[in-house]
Amino acid sequence: MTPEQSRKIHWASLEILERFGARLHHPEAISLLKSGGADVSDGNLVRIPSGLVEKAFTTVPKRVVLYNRHGQPVMPLEGNRCFYGPGSDCMNIIDHRTGERRRPVLGDVIEGITLCDALPDIDFAMSMVLPADVDQAIADVYQAQVMLAYTTKPLVLVSYELGGLIDAVRMAEAVVGGQDVLRRSPLVTCYINVVSGLNHNKEALQKLLYLSGKGLPALYVPASTGGVTCPVTPAGAVALDNAGVLLGLVISQLRREGAPYIMTGMQPSPMDMRTMVTPYADPQRGIFQAMARYYGLPAFGWGGVSDSKAVDQQAAAEAALTLLAESLVGGNIIHDLGYLESGLTFSLAQLVICSEIIGWIEAFLGGVQVTDETLALDVIAQTGPEGHYLNKEHTRQHFRESWSPTLFDRTDYKTWQDRGGRTLEQRAAERVEAILKEHEPTPLPDDVRAELCRIAEGATSR
C-alpha cells in the first residue's frame, strides 16, 4: 500500500472506534478505558476518541528487543529486520519417520524445539503442535516448560487463559533470574488472539493487561476472517482489524505507559466460499505490514505456510512465496513456518525446507558489495579474453561467499540418481533425523529445571 492508502485506513480505523465502538468482555479493561476518556454504553460497548489513540502513540516504544537465554539481544524488532520461526498448536503432525498424519504428543514438541535450537536460520521458537497426551486444560504450561528447557532462543508463547500465561512467565523468570531481569531482557513474548477487531474476549484482555502491567512485550492479534467476522475486501478487513490493534495499543499504554507492544502485520484471509476454508497462503495477507510501517511499530507476520496437505510441490512453492513476500514487506517476527493444511498440520521436514528457503532469501536481500576487490578489474586484465578464472587466487579467496544450499540439490542427474534419487521431502526428513540424533540443546541448571517442574505440577492442581 502507498502511504496515502495507509493514511486513509488509519482514519477509517479511528472512525470505526469513535463512531461504532467495540465490545469488550472484561470489566477492568472497560474501567481503564472509561477513566482514560472513552465512552461506555450498553454495558460493554466502548467508543474510543481519536485523541486517546494518538496519545498512546506518544508513549509506546517504536522498537522492541527480544533476548536469548544468555541475556544477549538477538532480535531487535525494528525497521525491516526480519526474524523467522514456526507457529503453535497445530492439531496434527506429519511424522517425518513414517509419513503418517497423526495427533501430536509432547515428545513432538521436544523434537520440534530441539530442531529450532539447531537450525541457524530459525531465530525464535513456538510450540508448533498441541500435544494430545497431556491434560488439555494446561497443555500450554507443558509446552512452555519444554520450550524453555530445549532452546536458548527467544520464545513466542501461546496461553489459553491467564493462569497458563502467569505460569509460563514465572518459568521464564526462573530461567533468566527474576522478574526484573525478564523485563529488562525479555526472553518471551505472548501471542494473544482476539475474536475480531471489534469483539475483544475476556481471556485476550486479561493477558494483555497482565503483560503490559509487567512491562513485557505483547503480541495483540485480531483473528478475523474476511467475509465472516470482517469485510471481505482487503481495505475493509485491514481497517476493522487495525481498529482492534489500536484499541489494544490504547489499553496497553493506559495500563502502563511505555509497555512494549507488537502489532499484527497479517491481513485477515478471506473465507474461500467454495470450500469454507480460510486459506493461509493468501497472496494479500502481508499488506497489513504497511500499517506497521506507517506507525513505525514492530510487527508480527507470517510466512513459510501452505494450504497443501502434504510436504509436496505446492507446500514448497507456497512456503517460498509467502516467506519472500513477507521478507520484502519487512515483517519483524515471521512465524508459522512449517504449517500445512491451512494451519491444522505441522511438519518438521517442512520446517527444514523453510530454513533452506530463508537462506536463499537472505542472500537475495543481502545485496552485492561493489568495491575494487569485488570488481576485480586487475584479475580481468591478467586473465584476458580467452583465459579462465579457476586457477586464480581471487577465485580461491571469494568463491565460498556465494550462497550454497545444504538441502536443495545442485548435482547432475547421474550423481543424484547414484545417491538414491531422493526427493526434497525425503532429504528434509533425513536432515530432521540427523539433527535430532546429533544436536544437544544447552541444558538448564538442575535447580532451574526443578523449579519449572514445580510450577508445572502446581498448574495441575489449579
Map each language-model feature to its residues.
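Catalytic-core signal marking the mid-to-C-terminal active-site face
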Residues: 1-12, 20, 25-32, 47, ...
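Hydrophobic alpha-helical scaffolding
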Residues: 2-3, 19-22, 43-46, 102, ...
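Short acidic (Asp/Glu) and glycine-rich catalytic loops that position anionic groups and cofactors
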Residues: 34-39, 187, 225, 266-270, ...
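Flexible, glycine/charged-enriched surface loops at secondary-structure junctions
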Residues: 23-30, 42-43, 123, 182-184, ...
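Helix-rich catalytic cores of soluble enzyme domains
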Residues: 103-332
